[in-house]
């Protein structure tokens, strides 16, 4: 069995990692991959804008630095999750992608032939739907060729 586990660095994601460890103990798991999909956009409000304004080299450099810091923070989420599996002697790999989270998760699961997607019921958005977060709900709806386990 191939398992794709989703993380966004939230407390719910930590629970998802813990439940994935339990599942790997009881199943014949061939592969575990941890995916993080970055849909965050770096805030452009830090750059002065206006009609006729051309950003200076210093402004552009500051913006590039903000982008790199953001990407580094996102990749650290994956490295922290990977460490959880390594500490439990489970081979795992990481997948970092940019895009719409639910679509990217489902597409990755389909293209790479994952048998199961494990995702938390809510993530970092802070917006709470009645039963599921918007990403987990969309993954449940869109994933047609694999099992989706939602961790509460």
Model region roles, listed by residue range:
Residues 6-7, 95, 120:
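Active-site-adjacent beta-strand anchor residues
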Residues 1-2, 152:
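Absolute protein N-terminus
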Residues 15, 104, 126:
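Phosphate- and divalent-cation-binding pockets in alpha/beta enzyme and binding domains
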Residues 33-35, 93-97, 149:
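General small-molecule cofactor/ligand-binding pocket signal
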Residues 2-61, 88:
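Small/aliphatic-rich secondary-structure junction motif
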Residues 76, 80-117:
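Structural beta-alpha unit
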Residues 55-73:
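A short acidic, glycine-rich active-site loop
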Residues 107-152:
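Gly/Ser-rich helix-loop-strand patches that form or flank binding pockets
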